[in-house]
Structures are given as structure tokens and as C-alpha cells.
A protein has these predicted regions:
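Sec/Tat signal peptide C-region and signal peptidase I cleavage site
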Residues: 15-19
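Central antiparallel beta-sheet cores of small beta-barrel/beta-sandwich binding domains
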Residues: 20-89, 97, 103, 116-197
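N-proximal helix/coil linker or "cap" segments that precede and/or mark the start of modular domains
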Residues: 208-251, 263-267
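A short beta-strand-turn-helix
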Residues: 248-270, 293-296
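Short, internal strand/loop/helix patches
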Residues: 249, 321-363
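Short pre-active-site segment immediately N-terminal to redox-active cysteine/selenocysteine motifs
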Residues: 268-270, 275-278, 285, 310, ...
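Structural microenvironment flanking redox-active thiols in thiol-disulfide oxidoreductases
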Residues: 284-327, 338-346
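Thiol-/selenol-based redox modules, centered on thioredoxin-like
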Residues: 354-406
Length: 406
């Protein structure tokens, strides 16, 4: 009788005593277009209260909800409308994440190893800025920027295009090359850098839109050789007639139609942001725009986001609502239509092809500036310069005498 009672007691303890915990750090890979891309993720909690986070440099992309039941792990990332589903067995996670560009991607993870025990490596110095030549751009670019920060064998940085960057790539030097990667819920990327004997870099990139090989050259050397430089994001896109402002007329999330001619915008500085909640670089820009609006709205600043989304998200913009909540957005958000319709609806824009693109309209109603793209903190000083430039433009326009809108 005592043995039966003991067995029953042990059975009652089994689910709690032997349930696997996922709390802690994990070394993971995501397979995208046949390439295994390493990244690190963290998790906490148990049962129906599991949380996970991906890293983008020092920033974290945190799941909105998650659970672990009977070895089945489910994590939701609402601001990307993505989900991670996996099995957890013997300290190994196997499953899939997505969609990323409509694809589900295999995920594999094991408990994180102790990198501190690794022997020191004498790595060549590659820190600083580089120009990347032979780029594969659909936007007419001839060069991109590569920004690297180095601490011994460890390197972090980003590739900056006219529309934005790769997110923070991190990695280290081993076997004659630097291997860096990024995955934070979006834009998976694997970057391999091989220092050449002539002081250049052989660069291989596997990312969202395929594989490419480039040559890294220091900016001063590129100028001396007459090589093309990166595209200027302040001149890449223009408008047909600055005097005519930037017209828009779209519904907000409650269905109310908002127009640039509404009285609420008259005599105000207006920042019009062409964006989409599906766009990683738009995620980079949104928190800064939210902070800028909250700081300057009492001085006469208005920010309007023209969001272009997929058809199903226009009917029920769940991802956009999560996007607004995540970044604390208090400015006006409008539904512009499907992404493919943006060009025909943005009637003033010339050479517009970057998500996001931001138009600055003065108190007089004239377009005073356009900026294509937006970098992430991974671009370092160039990220800070872009934020400073936006702030300086807004402050200058706010300081101008208020005039009636033309």
C-alpha cells in the first residue's frame, strides 16, 4: 500500500519535476534560401508564460506571447506577424519561423556555449568605414557603405544602402576570415569578410534577396581611384513641384479620411512618412519619429505615416496595430493601400523606390526636403548623423515664421 501511495505521489510530481525549461541563452541557426545563419536568442518563463527575444545589437525584439506545453514551443512576434513553432527535446530546439517574404524557415537551437573560454585570436584590423563596390542594387546604386566596429577578433557593424541597412551584424575572426550574421525576427543575413593583401576586403553577402560578392575599399582610396560612392539619401528622391506640397488623402485605422488640406495641418510643419509595417527599415525609423513627434508637437509639428500594406492587412491591420503599440506611436497613421499601388498614389514623388522615405513640408506648405531610407543603430555614427539631420531640419522649419498655407 505504501509503494502504491509513493508511486502516485511521484507521478503527481513528474510534470513539474521533469518538464524542460527553456530559460537562458541559446545558440541558434535559421535556414534561409539554403544558407544557415547563426544568431543568439534568449528565453525566460515557463508554461503559458514563455518569452523570447532576438538581438539587434544592443536592442531586443521580444515576443508578445509564448508557451511551452508537452515539449511544444510556440512564440508569437506580432509586430512582424510571425511565429516560431518548435519541439524541445533533450536541450535541443527544432522547428520553423516565419513567414519571411512568405517563406517558413527552419530553426535549430542548442544551449549557448561559453565563448569566454575560447583562445585569443590575432585578427587583422578592419574597423571603420568601407565602400562596397560591385553591388547588386535595384535602385541604381553603384556603391554601399560598410560600417565596422572591432574589438580584437570580435566585430559588429552593418551594410548601409540608400533604403537602410542590414541590422546589426555580429561575429568574429577565425580561419582567415570574419564571419558576421544577423537575425532579429527579420532580414536574416550572413556576411563573410576576407582581408586581401592589397588592403581591400573580399565580401560575400547572403541576405533576403540572394547572394552577392563585392569588394570593400576604404573611402579615401575609392575617391582617389575615381570609384563611385554611395548614393546620397537626401537627393535620391525628389518631388515634381515643391510649391505644391505633398498631397495625400487616405483613411486612418478607424476609417476617417485624412487629407493634407485639412485645417489641422495648416501652418504646421508636416513630416510625411511613406512606410509599411512589413518593412524592417521602417521599424528602425518608427521609434525615432515617435520620439520626435512627442517632443515637438506642442511647437507645431505634425507627423503623418502613409502605410502601404498587403491586402489582408488592409482589411484587418493586426500587424500595424502591434507596430503602433510597440513603438508608442501617437502621430497620425493612415492606410495608403497595397504596396504595389504606392507609386501611382504618390503623385509628387520622383524616383521614389525606398521604404521608408520621409518628406519634410514647411509651414508654408512647400516641400523642403526628402530623405530616402533610414539606418539602424548598427550603422553607428551614420545612424546618429541621420537622427541629427532630421532633428535639425524639423527645428529649422519650426523656427520659420508661420504663414498661411498656399
Amino acid at each position: 500500500m505504501q509503494r502504491i501511495a509513493l508511486a502516485a505521489f511521484l507521478c503527481s510530481l513528474a510534470p513539474a519535476a521533469f518538464a524542460q525549461s527553456v530559460a537562458g541563452m541559446w545558440d541558434a541557426t535559421i535556414t534561409y534560401n539554403g544558407t544557415d545563419i547563426p544568431f543568439r536568442m534568449g528565453m525566460s518563463g515557463t508554461g503559458a508564460n514563455v518569452k523570447a527575444w532576438f538581438f539587434n545589437g544592443d536592442d531586443k525584439e521580444v515576443s508578445n506571447a509564448g508557451k511551452l506545453e508537452n515539449g511544444k514551443l510556440v512564440l508569437n512576434f506580432d509586430s512582424y506577424l510571425a511565429k516560431l513553432t518548435a519541439t524541445v527535446k533533450d536541450g535541443v530546439i527544432d522547428g520553423e519561423y516565419g513567414p519571411i517574404l512568405k517563406k517558413m524557415c527552419a530553426i535549430h537551437a542548442v544551449r549557448a556555449s561559453d565563448t569566454k573560454s575560447q583562445a585569443k585570436v590575432n585578427a587583422p584590423s578592419i574597423g571603420g568605414q568601407w565602400n562596397l563596390q560591385n553591388v547588386a542594387s535595384s535602385k541604381g546604386e553603384k556603391a554601399w557603405q560598410l560600417i565596422l566596429r572591432q574589438n580584437g577578433a570580435d566585430v559588429s557593424g552593418a551594410i548601409l544602402r540608400v533604403d537602410g541597412d542590414t541590422g546589426t551584424l555580429t561575429g568574429s575572426y577565425k580561419d582567415g576570415k570574419f564571419v558576421l550574421s544577423h537575425f532579429s525576427g527579420s532580414r536574416p543575413a550572413l556576411l563573410i569578410l576576407k582581408p586581401a593583401s592589397d588592403g581591400t576586403l573580399d565580401v560575400s553577402l547572403s541576405a533576403l534577396h540572394g547572394f552577392s560578392e563585392m569588394k570593400g575599399v576604404r573611402p579615401e582610396e575609392a575617391r582617389a581611384k575615381g570609384l563611385p560612392g554611395p548614393t546620397d539619401p537626401d537627393t535620391h528622391t525628389t518631388v515634381k513641384d515643391p510649391e505644391k506640397g505633398f498631397p495625400f488623402r487616405f483613411p486612418d485605422l478607424q476609417g476617417k479620411v485624412v487629407s493634407n488640406t485639412d485645417a489641422r495641418f495648416r501652418g504646421k510643419v508636416l513630416v510625411v512618412n511613406v512606410t509599411g509595417s512589413w518593412c524592417p527599415n521602417c521599424h528602425d525609423e518608427a521609434p525615432f519619429l515617435a520620439q520626435m513627434y512627442d517632443k515637438y508637437k506642442s511647437q507645431g509639428l505634425e507627423v503623418v505615416a502613409l502605410n502601404f500594406e498587403e491586402a489582408d492587412q488592409l482589411k484587418d491591420p493586426t500587424r500595424l496595430r502591434a507596430f503602433i503599440k510597440e513603438y508608442g506611436i501617437h502621430y497620425t497613421v493612415l492606410l495608403g493601400g497595397e504596396t504595389d499601388s504606392a507609386k501611382e498614389k504618390l503623385t509628387q514623388a520622383v524616383n521614389w523606390d525606398a521604404w521608408p522615405t520621409t518628406f519634410f513640408v514647411g509651414r508654408d506648405g512647400r516641400v523642403r526636403g526628402v530623405h530616402a531610407g533610414f539606418p539602424s543603430p548598427g550603422s553607428g555614427e551614420l545612424y546618429r548623423e541621420t537622427k541629427d539631420k532630421f532633428t535639425a531640419t524639423v527645428e529649422k522649419l519650426l523656427a520659420e515664421n508661420q504663414t498661411s498655407k498656399k
